[in-house]
Structures are given as C-alpha cells and as structure tokens.
C-alpha cells in the first residue's frame, strides 16, 4: 500500500511537472503578441484596439475593406514615424517592439514587403543588400560576409524567386515593372531571412504567373521557426500561400478570426455580412 501511494505521488508529481514544462514551452512559442494597440496619424485614430498573437511557424492572413487599418498596422509594427502609438503593447520574441527604432526591429528579424516598393536611383541592388545583410550580421555579433561569400548567397537566394541576375546590377527598383518590384521585395526577404515577414498587399497589381512566383518564394522560405502576416484583399493569393489563421480587420479592430475557410466566404459574400454581425 505504501509503495502504491508513493507511486501515485510520483506519477502526480511527474504529471504536474510535465504540465509546467508544456506551459513554459507554449508560452515561448509566441513570436508576436499585440495587446490593445491604438495608433493615430495626426488627430485621426486608425487602430482602435488591435489584439493579435502569432506563434512560431504560423501564417496569418489579414483581410478587410479599404481604410480598415491594415497597412497602418504593418507600418506601426515596423516603426513608421508618421504614426503615433497612443495605447497598448507589441512584444516581439520577448522584447518590447514599440521601444525599438525601425532599424533595430529589422535587425531583430522583422521585415516589411511594401505595397508600393520605392525606387532608389544610384544605389545598386548588390550594394544595398550587402550593406543590409552585413548590418544585421553585425547586430547579431557575426562577422561580415566576404565578397565571394555574399555573391554565393545572393545567387542562391535569387534562384528561390526566379530573379534574373541582371536585376542585382541595377539600381534598387529603378525602371522595374510592378511585378519585378514585388519579386525583388521577396528576394530581399530571402537575403535577410527574417523571423516575421509582413507582406502588405504583395499581390496588388500582379498577374497570375507573377503571383505564383512570389508565393512560391514565400513558401520555400517558410519554416517551423519563421512566421508571416499576409495582408491581402484577395482569396486567390491565399490559395497559394496557405494561412493557418484568417483575420478580418474593420474600423481599426480585428472583428473576426477563423481558419482559411473565412477567406473563401469573404470572396463569395464580401464584407457586408461581417459589418452586420459587428453592428456597424
């Protein structure tokens, strides 16, 4: 009887320990945790209480009508100085994202693919990326890549997004078509190997073939340790980049969250039924 009680006690203790370990592991999986985030530009409040949790390896899609705050959310997370955070918090891998400068956020592993990529005349893609890659390595305490090492890395990564080598010799995005600019953004993402990528309407203006190349590049780079936020109006991109979770952002708040089926329902029904549900 005594041995039985001891055995039960040991089993209970082990079970409790396993629960604690599981809880700790679960807790550390949160890559990004946004709580009650409010932000404004000038006197206009745009984000009105965003709550969002993204774990390692997850892809989250954010959809919503025009003017809902989708691009504002990406701008705030990456540190655009035009926006002022008035309330809430954003924790990225255990660190306060809102206290970091934009370049620190990038070096910590945050990447934004712009809806309208900018041109930088006079700065070659090769020099631009070499500076960015080595800056991140310096931040991480790693030595700079030598010229041969960098060229090798660049050649490997451009194959991922099917980017012709001639683009790496040109100025950043100068004279690029819309599709080439978007593909170039994904190439930059491949070079920088971010932990969390934010794709802000990357599919905007792309034909089906260009969209497939971009989506394939994103999928090839996705691992169990990297995550992504895909901001889009269209379900067709989400047929290529499979999200774990789909959110609807409306009037500065996430008003609905579900699985990939939500994107298909929005494609079929639009947003009016969601507006009716939230009573606005």
Predicted regions and their residues:
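Walker B catalytic motif
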Residues: 198-202, 209
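ABC ATPase C-loop
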Residues: 189-190
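ABC ATPase NBD Q-loop/coupling interface
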Residues: 89-105, 173
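Conserved hydrophobic segment flanking the Walker A/P-loop of ABC-type ATPase nucleotide-binding domains
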Residues: 54-56
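Conserved beta-strand-loop-alpha-helix hinge in the C-terminal portion
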Residues: 245, 249, 253-276
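The feature captures the beta-strand-to-loop junction immediately N-terminal to the Walker
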Residues: 63-65
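Conserved structural motif at the start of ABC-family nucleotide-binding domains
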Residues: 32-34, 47
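Q-loop/switch helix immediately C-terminal to the Walker
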Residues: 112-116, 122-138, 150-153
């Amino acid at each position: 009887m005594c041995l039985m009680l001891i055995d039960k006690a040991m089993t209970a203790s082990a079970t409790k320990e396993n629960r604690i370990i599981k809880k700790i592991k679960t807790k550390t999986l949160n890559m990004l945790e946004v709580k009650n985030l409010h932000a404004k530009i000038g006197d206009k409040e745009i984000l009105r209480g965003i709550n969002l949790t993204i774990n390692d390896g997850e892809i989250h899609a954010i959809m919503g009508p025009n003017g809902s705050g989708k691009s504002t959310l990406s701008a705030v997370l990456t540190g655009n100085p035009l926006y002022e955070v008035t309330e809430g918090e954003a924790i990225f891998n255990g660190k306060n994202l809102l206290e970091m400068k934009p370049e620190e956020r990038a070096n910590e592993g945050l990447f934004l693919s712009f809806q309208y990529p900018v041109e930088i005349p006079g700065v070659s893609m090769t020099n631009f990326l070499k500076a960015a890659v080595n800056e991140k390595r310096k931040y991480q305490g790693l030595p700079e890549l030598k010229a041969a090492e960098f060229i090798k890395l660049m050649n490997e990564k451009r194959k991922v997004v099917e980017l012709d080598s001639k683009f790496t010799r040109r100025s950043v995005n100068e004279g690029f078509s819309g599709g080439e600019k978007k593909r170039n953004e994904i190439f930059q993402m491949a070079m920088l190997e971010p932990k969390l990528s934010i794709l802000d309407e990357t599919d905007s203006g792309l034909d089906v073939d260009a969209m497939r190349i971009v989506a394939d590049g994103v999928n090839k780079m996705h691992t169990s340790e990297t995550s992504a936020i895909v901001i889009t109006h269209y379900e067709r991109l989400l047929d290529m980049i499979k999200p774990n979770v789909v959110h609807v952002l409306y009037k500065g708040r996430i008003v609905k969250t579900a699985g990939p089926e939500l994107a298909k329902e929005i494609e079929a029904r639009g947003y009016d039924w969601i507006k009716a549900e939230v009573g606005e």
